[in-house]
Amino acid sequence: MSLAGDVARDFRRDGAVRLRGALVPQMVDLLRSGIDENLARPSPRAKTASRPDDPGRFVEDFCCWDENPAYRRFIFESGLGQVAAELMGSPTARLYHDHMLTKEAGTLQPTPWHQDQPYYNVEGRQNVSFWVPVDPVSRAASLEFVAGSHLGPWLMPRSFMDAQAKWFPEGSLADLPDIEADRAAWPILGWALEPGDVVAFHMLTLHSAAGADRRRRVFSVRFLGEDATHAPRAWPTSPDFPGLEAELPAGAPMDHPLFPVVWPAAS
């Protein structure tokens, strides 16, 4: 799978692009089966990210690719590794982690505006996340982005339900602006999506999502380019990689079995 040149240009400019019809139906079916298996047998890392009184439910799970055969096949056979390398401008695309996000119909819990990279244990500019729905997603329930925000500074990561600074110390990074207070002032991107569509975004692009008007099963897979290095934190990252610092020192390339190279494919 290869991209038209203007797609990579738009990604570099806006920090988010839609890849319409990027996946063949067989890959969507494979991924859907993997998500359903994951929901039926969640890993110890799974969590409910909605409040107990929410009429729906928001479930997340992380780092399941080595335990879920459908996820593994999807990551290595879907062609997204090559797309990642092209978007990043990197000769290689290395898996960082997978992330399953399912909002059941009627879920009220929004995903507040945030950047992803401040929650992580990596430094570097070459990165991309793919947001892959296996159900139709309305524009109102889809992920949305502030175009160009990936070119700005890191902003304070906070917990989604109580806005606590559980990662970087309070005051060490600037807080996010109140985008919802004046949405018209911001260049917001978002798209209605069908199974087979993929959204690609940079880990520093500000993004959010509303609740779900119908069931919304999504798989997100995140890739790192050649400039990515390990950045151990003094706090648990999200997701966390316990013990990794003993094997991968600060500043080292992310060359570790947890993060295999997906593109180019091994011969």
Label the model's feature ranges.
Residues 1-13, 20-113, 119-121, 236:
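Non-heme Fe(II)-dependent double-stranded beta-helix
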Residues 90-91, 117, 133-143, 148-150:
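Active-site region of the double-stranded beta-helix
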Residues 91-93, 97-98, 109-111, 126-132, ...:
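Generic beta-strand structural signal
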Residues 104, 138, 152, 207, ...:
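Feature marks short, surface-exposed loop/turn motifs that line or immediately flank catalytic pockets
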Residues 115-127, 186, 193, 214-215:
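A short beta-loop-beta micro-motif enriched in histidine and acidic residues
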Residues 139-205:
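Double-stranded beta-helix
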